[in-house]
C-alpha cells in the first residue's frame, strides 16, 4: 500500500524523521518530483529541529500552497514550482539566460580584448582556453551544483560545514562592494546614452565651453602627432621649434572635464555631480523594478537584457569590418606572438580573466542555481554558460579592434596608440571612434545601450544574491512574505552608498574598489570553498550528492579538477596576484598611501569573515576538547541536504516516526478517502486509489 514504508537510515547523527505518504511515480513521470501529489487528508510529518532548520517553511509550503514569497496568492506559474516557499525559475531558459547575463558583463567588452592584444594576440587564446577547461568550467559546475542541491543562497549552503559559513558572509561582502560601484558604471553609461540623443555628439568637436587649447578633435584634423610652431624671441630673432603636440581628444576632455569634473585628489570630493546622481537613481530604480518579484520577474526581463547585447555586437561588428583600417585592427588583435606563451604573466592574466569573468566566488552562481528544480542538469548548463561567456569575450574583441583599427588608420598612428581598457575604452577611446562614423549618434546610442544591458545583467544577480542570503538566513514566514521590502531596502542602501562615487573624486574611489574589493579576496574565498567541500565534507559525499541530484556522478575529469587541478590553479592565481601587485594609479595620478590602505582594508573585510565566523562557531559548538569541537563544527548540520522532503532519499531519507512533541500530530490516512490525483506535465490529471 502507498505510504507507511520506511527508508534507509540517515547519515547525519541526530536527524530523526517521520515516515510519510510516498507516491509511486507513474510511467509518464520523467523525473522524481515532477508529478504533483495531493492527498484528500494531508498529513504533515516533520522531524525534531525542523522549526530552526529552515526546512519547516518548505514542508508547510508543500501542504499549504497559499504561502508564497512576497505574500502573493500563487499564480499558475507559481503553482508549478517544486519549492513553493522560495519559488523556481519559470523554465530552464530563464536560468541559462540569467547566468549568461551575470557572467557576460562589462569586463568581456573592455578588459579581455586589451589583455589579448597585450599578451600576444592570438597566442593568448591558448592559455586562456586551457584555464577555461581546467579551472573555469569546473568551478562554475561546483558552484551551480552546490546551490542547486541545497536550494539555498550563499549563506544557507554552508549547512554542509557550519564552521565555514564565513565564506558565505565573505561572498556577501564582495557582492556588496561590486554592486555599489558596478551600478555607478551603469549610471555613467545611462548618462552617455542620454547625451547621445542629439544631432551632433557633444564629444565630437573642441568648440565647447569645457575644452582646453590642447584639444584636437579627430574630425578637425588628422595626423596631429607631430607639429611645428614658430616663436619670436628677443626682438628680431625667431626660432622654429619642433615639438610634439600633446593632443587631448574632445572625448577625453568631455569625460574628464565635463562628465566627471575630475578633482585633483582622491580626498578632494568637491561637489556631487547631480546629472550622475540622477542617472544613478534611474539605474537603481530599473534594477529594483526588474527584481520586484525576485526570479519570477527578472527571469522574464533577461529574455531581452541577455540577448539584445548580441544583436548590438553583431550590428557594430558588421559596421566595423566594412571600415578602412578595420582589418589592421583585427590583425593586431589576433596575430599570435608565440614567444609570449613562455611568460608566466601571460598565463597569470589568462587564469585571472577566466576566474573573474565567470563570476566565481561572488555568491551569484550559488544563488541563481538555488532556484533551479532539484533534478535540473546543471552540468550541462555550466558547460554552455562558461563557453558562451568566453566566446562572447573573443567576439567582442573583433568588434572593439575593428573600430579602433579604423580610428588608428584615420589618425595615421599605430593601433597601440588608441587601444585602451576599462573606463578609458568605454567612455573615451570607443566614443571618439564612433564620432568618425556617419549617423554617429545612432551608433553611440546602440553602444551605450549595450553597455547598460550588460551591466544590468550582472547587477540583477548581485542584488538578488544579497536579498536571497538575507531571506534564507532569517527564514521566517514574515520575511518570506515581505521579500519585496527587503529588495527595496537593499536597493536604497546601495543607492545611498553609491552617492560618494558620483562626486568629483568618484572615479578615484570607483577604481580603488574595483582593484581591491574584488581581487585576491575572491581567490582566497574560492580556494577555501574547494578545500572545505572536497576535503572537509568529503569528495565521496559530494559526488554521491550530485549523483542523487543528477542521476549520474560528476565525470572523472571534474572529480580530478575539483580535488587537485583547480585548487592548484587558484593557488597559482593567488601567488601571481601578489607577485604582480603594483600600487594603483589613474592616468598619471598616484594614489596616496592612506587610500591604498583603505583598499587593503576593503579586501581584508571579506576574507576576515572566514576566520572570525570559524572562531565564533567553535565557541558555540559542544565538545569536551578543542578537537571534538572542531569535529562537531565542521560536520554537516542535520538539516543539510535537499530542501524538499520528496528529494530527501538515500542517506537523507526520513527513518523514524515523530512524536506529537515534535510539533505536529501524526494522523493516519483514512482508507476510504485517500486518493492521489496524478497531474501530468501537460495538465491532465487522473485519480488513483491509495490502496493496492
Curated annotation (Swiss-Prot):
The modification Phosphoserine is found at residues 659, 684. GO terms for biological process: glycine import across plasma membrane; glycine secretion, neurotransmission; glycine transport; neurotransmitter uptake; positive regulation of heme biosynthetic process; positive regulation of hemoglobin biosynthetic process; regulation of synaptic transmission, glycinergic. It holds the Pfam family SNF. Disruption phenotype: Mice show severe motor and respiration deficits at birth and die during the first postnatal day. Accumulation of glycine in the synaptic cleft results in over-activation of postsynaptic glycine receptors and death of the newborn animals due to respiratory and feeding problem. GO terms for cellular component: apical plasma membrane; basolateral plasma membrane; dense core granule; endosome; hippocampal mossy fiber to CA3 synapse; lateral plasma membrane; membrane; parallel fiber to Purkinje cell synapse. The modification Phosphothreonine is found at residue 657. It is a multi-pass membrane protein. The chain crosses the membrane at residues 95-115, 122-142, 174-194, 272-292, 301-321, 346-366, 393-413, 436-456, 492-512, 516-536, 556-576, 596-616. Residues 195-271 are extracellular. Residues 1-34 are annotated as: Disordered. The keyword Repressor does not apply. Its main location: membrane. Residues 681-692 are annotated as: Essential for interaction with EXOC1. Keywords: Amino-acid transport, Cell membrane, Membrane, Neurotransmitter transport, Phosphoprotein, Symport, Transmembrane, Transmembrane helix, Transport. It catalyses: glycine(out) + chloride(out) + 2 Na(+)(out) = glycine(in) + chloride(in) + 2 Na(+)(in). One of its GO terms (molecular function) is glycine transmembrane transporter activity. InterPro entries: Na/ntran_symport, Na/ntran_symport_glycine_GLY1, SNS_sf. It comes from the Eukaryota. Interacts with EXOC1; interaction increases the transporter capacity of SLC6A9 probably by promoting its insertion into the cell membrane. Interacts with EXOC3 and EXOC4. Sodium- and chloride-dependent glycine transporter which is essential for regulating glycine concentrations at inhibitory glycinergic synapses. This is Sodium- and chloride-dependent glycine transporter 1. It comes from Mus musculus. The gene is Slc6a9.
